[in-house]
Amino acid sequence: MKSVFTLSASLAISLMLCCTAQANDHKILGVIAMPRNETNDLALKLPVCRIVKRIQLSADHGDLQLSGASVYFKAARSASQSLNIPSEIKEGQTTDWININSDNDNKRCVSKITFSGHTVNSSDMATLKIIGDD
């Protein structure tokens, strides 16, 4: 009887942990090394097309300056959207959530995100981390 109770308790705890893990759907989509010179062709290609409703940007190493960003959706006509992003992100700073307006039912998936920008105030390359929320 004691083993049945222990087994039941273990299953209940693992179900709670499972559901807790699924409540937070934030995923690191990737990291981009930002060059020291202004570049407009920095791309994060997602190997698996993901439905992403919003993103956060984080400067993990070094300060960076951004001049633009676009999201490309997997669609027959290669739809894209320009994003309203902050022009500067300091090391250790994370932006607020940036909404991605996919179609009305949020079923379009993101195939790539492009950035224009560069590292500032450093001889090392800054790194830009992209976090997605689906």
UniProtKB/Swiss-Prot annotation:
It comes from the Bacteria. Keywords: Signal. Residues 1-23 form the signal peptide. Pfam families: DUF2541. InterPro entries: UPF0412_YaaI (IPR020240). Transmembrane segments: none annotated. Belongs to the UPF0412 family. This is UPF0412 protein YaaI. It comes from Escherichia coli O17:K52:H18 (strain UMN026 / ExPEC). The lineage of its organism: Bacteria, Pseudomonadati, Pseudomonadota, Gammaproteobacteria, Enterobacterales. The gene is yaaI.
